[in-house]
């Protein structure tokens, strides 16, 4: 980017704005919207979306408009979830000018911010409006259909009652197993496994999604609630070190369990300073994210910044979370450990199973039932568009309070409100998958949505 060109950068969070302003070139001025400056108002009858100005945010809107007049470039860097999309769209409408761009924040390092400022795309507010209206249309017509439950309840029913892809299983004694690859099976299917005697197998440690981190933060007692865990993760993301102004971790709201190719290269160069290059995963084992994916996995920006070296700058809980993320990332980039025991199933050749809770567990055979962990649930619901990473912690706590689900040892089980609808699980799964695809349709009509809902 041309650092002499005056750029107006618009973000959601005042904390982000303060951190980023220190690291940006002097020619970049940052304004935080502090959430919604407008509230969405959807007219289902006319299929129109309006942005109704929040009177308490008048000063922010005024400043955005005034600064935009002087700026050579305007960049909106909000989340890629529906809330972030609405903020980007409403700001673009306020400015009523072409050439507004959108950027994606990957991390709060100086290099990360400069990279974001250079790698921006023209904001297509018409396309954004269509996508937003489609989501509002789907939710509006769903809520008016008396034959359908709450859309989130339907999503949970589809996860627990329909055939899905599983990577976690429980044996007869409640010991949690993991499979080397996902298996397509029914939720009540029994999978018989027996010891593998001919091949050596290894643990599978993948890079971290938001869902994985929140699961671990609650399990490790860094947080009492999942929403608290999400706030803790956000706090860690916004933390910069006093002695260097360096940020600690990458973007905290992501469904990815993979790194970009350039991140793998950076990690490799960093790790060489700590250990041997021979200890790193070979390329064929690396989880590589698509270059056009909005975000990659969560990881420490500098492996040379070890947990013990920053412990004095971090309070207890953020420090413990950083330590956990750091050590998990090291495991995910280095050669996997050999398993003492692994199990196979005749109907799924090439896939092996191993116990997660107790690696000394050994029996001649076992019967495994598919199960859904906290992180599995997040991944599944994100795929159907029901729940994005940014809302996962808060929503999970709400479902627990409502008695829709129970969670024990990270395994999620459905309760009566979900169980009572299991006979329609496949139908809900089909409807939700179809609607999620149609949400990107530029010519989606109410008639099309009604037809899908009635199928």
Residue ranges and their predicted role:
Residues 22, 29, 38-55, 148-238, ...:
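Long, highly charged, low-complexity internal segments
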Residues 132-143, 158-160, 204-208, 212, ...:
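Core structural elements
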Residues 273-301, 428-455:
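Leucine-rich, amphipathic alpha-helical/linker segments
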Residues 151, 162-169, 237-268, 289-308, ...:
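Catalytic phosphate-handling regions of large nucleic-acid enzymes and associated NTPases
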Residues 109-113, 211, 232-239, 244-254, ...:
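Short, conserved phosphate-binding/catalytic loop or strand-edge motifs used
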Residues 245-272, 394-429:
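Accessory beta->alpha helical hairpin/"wing" motif in late/C-terminal subdomains of nucleic-acid enzymes
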């Amino acid at each position: 980017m041309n650092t002499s060109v005056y750029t107006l950068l618009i973000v959601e969070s005042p904390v982000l704005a303060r951190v980023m302003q220190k690291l940006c070139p002097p020619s970049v001025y940052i304004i935080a919207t502090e959430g919604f400056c407008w509230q969405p108002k959807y007219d289902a009858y006319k299929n129109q979306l309006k942005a109704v100005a929040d009177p308490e945010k008048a000063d922010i809107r005024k400043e955005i408009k005034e600064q935009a007049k002087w700026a050579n470039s305007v960049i909106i860097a909000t989340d890629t979830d529906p809330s972030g999309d609405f903020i980007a769209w409403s700001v673009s409408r306020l400015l009523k000018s072409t050439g507004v761009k959108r950027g994606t924040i990957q991390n709060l390092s100086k290099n990360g911010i400069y990279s974001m400022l250079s790698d921006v795309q023209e904001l297509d507010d018409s396309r954004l409006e269509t996508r937003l209206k489609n989501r509002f249309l789907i939710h509006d017509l769903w809520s008016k259909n008396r034959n359908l439950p709450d859309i989130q309840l339907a999503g949970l029913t589809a996860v627990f009652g329909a055939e899905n892809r599983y990577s976690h299983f429980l044996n007869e004694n409640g010991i949690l197993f993991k499979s080397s690859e996902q298996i397509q099976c029914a939720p009540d299917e029994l999978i018989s496994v027996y010891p593998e005697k001919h091949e050596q197998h290894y643990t599978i440690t993948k890079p971290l999604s938001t869902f994985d981190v929140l699961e671990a933060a609650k399990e490790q007692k860094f947080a009492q609630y999942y929403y608290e865990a999400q706030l803790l993760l956000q706090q860690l993301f916004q933390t910069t070190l006093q002695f260097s102004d360096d940020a600690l971790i990458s973007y905290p709201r992501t469904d990815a369990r993979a790194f970009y190719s350039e991140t793998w290269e950076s990690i490799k160069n960093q790790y060489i300073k700590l250990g041997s290059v021979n200890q790193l995963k070979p390329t064929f084992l690396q989880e590589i994210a698509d270059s056009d994916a909005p975000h990659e996995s969560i990881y420490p920006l500098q492996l040379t910044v070890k947990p013990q070296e920053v412990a004095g700058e971090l309070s207890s809980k953020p420090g413990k979370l950083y330590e956990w993320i750091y050590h998990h990332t090291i495991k995910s980039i280095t050669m996997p450990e050999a398993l003492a025991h692994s199990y196979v199933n005749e109907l799924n050749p090439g896939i092996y199973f191993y116990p997660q809770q107790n690696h000394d567990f050994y029996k001649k055979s076992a019967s495994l039932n598919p199960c859904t962990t906290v992180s599995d649930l997040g991944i599944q619901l994100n795929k159907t568009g029901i729940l994005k990473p940014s809302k996962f912690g808060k929503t999970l706590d709400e479902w627990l309070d409502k008695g829709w689900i129970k969670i024990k040892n990270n395994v999620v089980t459905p309760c009566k409100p979900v169980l009572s609808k299991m006979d329609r699980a496949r139908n809900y799964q089909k409807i939700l998958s179809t609607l999620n695809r149609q949400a990107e349709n530029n010519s989606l009509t109410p008639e099309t949505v009604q037809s899908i809902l009635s199928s």
